[in-house]
């Protein structure tokens, strides 16, 4: 009986320690997202034929990815890609654009600190006349 109580006590202690370790990890990832998005640049896209370039920008340790979201209320969409200007004049992901709306989404992932890039943005359709968006990198 004493052995069972000792084992139960040890299991409760381990569970408590594991639970305590999970909260700070969640808080750290939340804090990292806040600091990344907290430094976001506000930009504006006005409709034109073909893509428009923004930048150049240089990545920092604030974000591991290049992220984008639309902040205009009309639920529009924009196509976007990243061009790493010191290495190429083509978009990432085999020169393909990705579609972006109001939720934060990555345009490029796992980008090294100090990398120079431009953001290329184009309209999803002609409704994208005057679109505000944010860029976090």
Predicted regions and their residues:
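Post-signal peptide N-terminal regions of Sec-secreted extracellular proteins
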Residues: 28-137
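Secretory targeting and sorting signals
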Residues: 1-28
């Amino acid at each position: 009986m004493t052995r069972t109580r000792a084992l139960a006590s040890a299991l409760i202690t381990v569970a408590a320690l594991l639970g305590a370790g999970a909260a700070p990890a969640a808080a750290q990832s939340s804090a990292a997202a806040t600091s990344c998005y907290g430094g976001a640049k506000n930009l504006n896209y006005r409709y034109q034929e073909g893509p428009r370039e923004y930048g150049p920008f240089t990545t920092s340790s604030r974000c591991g990815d290049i992220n984008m979201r639309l902040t205009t209320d009309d639920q529009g969409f924009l196509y976007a890609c990243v061009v790493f200007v010191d290495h190429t004049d083509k978009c990432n992901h085999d020169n393909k654009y990705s579609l972006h709306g109001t939720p934060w989404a990555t345009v490029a992932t796992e980008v090294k600190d100090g990398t120079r890039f431009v953001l290329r943005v184009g309209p999803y359709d002609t409704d994208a006349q005057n679109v505000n968006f944010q860029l976090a990198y």
